[in-house]
Amino acid sequence: MSEAKRFTKLIGVGAAAATLALVAGACGGGGEGGVSTGPSEGEGGGDKEITIGLIPWEEDIAVTHLWKAVLEEKGYTVNIENVDVAPVFQGTADGDIDLYLDTWLPNTHGEYWDKYGDKVEDLGAWNEGASLELTVPSYMEDVNSIEDLKGKSDEFGGEIIGIESGSGLVQTTEEEAMPAYGLEGEYKLVKSSTPAMLEELRTAIKEEKPIVVTLWRPHIVYAQEDLKDLEDPKGAMGEPESIHSIGRPGFSEDYPDLAEWIGNFKLSDEQIGSLEQTVIGEYEGEETEGAKAWLADNPDYLKEVMGDDAKGLDFSS
């Protein structure tokens, strides 16, 4: 693929894609994070300060605020940098960002991994089932595979509703899936924005009209609407991926405890779905409070991740 096969969006938090500079962006998670004013100090000396890069994707918002809640309880000062995908990798490689929690491998961020992978620390994968999808409402009983779209363009108005034009999801759909299934001359891939795609999807569902959209898992909309991903017998949308956490050079040396916790960090699809629903769906504008609420509802979770280091952490109040 020619670029990272991913996309930006922010549902229910009201934001646009962040700019291509390490500046605060317009995403709901950003309201609680500051901007780092200098290098973070490690666990062994001075104040414990850490800067986490945040892309406005649901799973990243959810897990970033999860760790913000935990680390603040452990005495860290947590700064959140709202960034786009290219600068989050460059910033981590350069040491301006300490931690980024949403690296999709091997395909979605493959281009960036080829460029920066030897300049950052891979801290491990926390989810193994991430995927890119073409998706329709479940009431479309006669469309179950991408193959079923062929010959039905009139039904869909000749459109596949996509997201941002530079996104990897759009590129995968346009460069791989549409040619593989012979849809190029029959359908137009509409490129707009993720919020616009979601609005069209919800409008179509209210009216029970046909629609096919580009989507991805994990995503909060699967918990909100009755959807089905189209089968992809040719594998054009790519194989399932792993979501990794990465750290700046020297991260494990400077933050040995945190590196161990991050290495133990795992979330199932069910867990990330419930975390997203709480953090984004129920606590818009107060995402860290949402993370605390989720931790209060899952009191044993941190014991699995942090072991004895979880003692004394109480989010029930």
Regions found by a protein language model. Give the residues of each.
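Short, well-ordered beta-strand elements
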Residues: 46-59, 76-81, 157-161, 262
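C-terminal motif of bacterial Sec signal peptides marking the signal peptidase cleavage site
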Residues: 21-26
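A conserved helix-loop-strand patch within extracytoplasmic ligand-binding domains
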Residues: 118-166
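Short, low-complexity, disordered segments immediately C-terminal to signal peptides
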Residues: 27-48
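Ligand-binding cleft/hinge of the Venus flytrap
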Residues: 67-74, 155-187
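Short helix-initiation/N-cap motifs at beta->coil->alpha
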Residues: 57-58, 79-91, 188-200
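A bilobed periplasmic-binding-protein/Venus flytrap-type ligand-binding module shared by bacterial periplasmic
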Residues: 131-141, 241-256, 277-278
